[in-house]
Regions:
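Beta-turn initiation residues at beta-strand->coil junctions
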Residues: 60-65, 88-93, 111-116, 158, ...
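Gly/Pro-enriched, hydrophobic low-complexity segments
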Residues: 150-256
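Short, hydrophobic/aromatic-rich segments at coil-to-beta transitions
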Residues: 51-57, 81-88, 147-155, 171-172, ...
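Bacterial N-terminal signal peptides
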Residues: 9-17
Length: 256
């Protein structure tokens, strides 16, 4: 259960952005904020997703011994421009906060958390959906039905430079050895509407490599030594379902 709680806190976007706040130890946030400009190879349905207002549900689940267990669910909505986002926790009920609002320009944004009906203001980094800004090489893998809709399923994978991200955020070379992780994705696209309906991300390798990075930083050991201590047998995935695209979405930021 301890490993699963760590996965839950660190892998869901909003939780991952906020989880390290107030922590005394150095821990890697498992968010995906190493952002590059969109390039000409990005398909229309993906670029449209990045620039649309929409509602979504994210579920983080683990697969172990052929048993799938959903460990966290959040629901949210996004206003693309100017950026606003609202997230509420559906599961687990014992979370320290129940809902959060994000707003701001660029990568540095403001978050307002509802903690037991008391608002807390924090500065944080904007979280982007997995794959944003990466040089994705998408390929059509198959056709599969999703919620009764025949979808084209595209696959992609990209490499995350964890060493570079950690050192950039800290402003110094905390880790001197390379640590990289491969993130694999599946995109379910409605070809009739040319819309992204669902994105499934396998973050298992990133989960393991992040645990290795945390060991290197907190235990002052080498990457090779940390690899011997870390063993992640679970497959960790995040499923992001687009519930609706809606230009009329309006997010009211609480006044505090």
């Amino acid at each position: 259960m301890k490993v699963r709680m760590i996965c839950m806190i660190l892998l869901i976007s909003s939780i991952s952005v906020l989880s390290a706040c107030g922590s005394k130890e150095k821990n890697v946030e498992k968010n995906d904020t190493d952002v590059l400009p969109l390039n000409d190879s990005v398909p229309g349905w993906l670029e449209s997703f990045y620039n649309s207002d929409y509602e979504y549900r994210k579920s983080t689940f683990v697969l172990e011994n052929d048993i799938e267990d959903t460990i966290a669910v959040v629901e949210g909505k996004v206003e693309a421009s100017p950026y606003k986002e609202y997230v509420k926790i559906v599961e687990p009920a014992e979370s320290s906060w129940s809902e959060v609002w994000f707003y701001g320009d660029g990568d540095d944004v403001t978050a307002i958390l509802n903690i037991e009906n008391d608002y807390v203001l924090q500065n944080t980094r904007r979280f982007y959906p997995y794959g944003y800004g990466s040089n994705l090489s998408l390929s059509k893998d198959r056709t599969e039905e999703y919620n009764g809709i025949p979808c084209d399923v595209y696959t992609a994978e990209y490499t995350v430079n964890l060493t570079g991200q950690i050192n950039q955020k800290s402003g110094e070379a905390i880790i001197t050895e390379p640590i990289t992780a491969v993130v694999s994705q599946e995109y379910y696209v409605d070809p009739e509407q040319d819309q992204l309906l669902c994105m499934i991300t396998d973050a298992s390798d990133r989960q393991e490599k992040t645990e290795i990075a945390n060991r290197v930083m907190n235990d002052n050991i080498t990457v090779e030594e940390a690899q011997k201590l870390v063993s992640v047998d679970e497959v960790t995935k995040e499923k992001m379902e687009i519930l609706s695209y809606d230009d009329s979405i309006s997010i009211d930021i609480p006044e505090i």
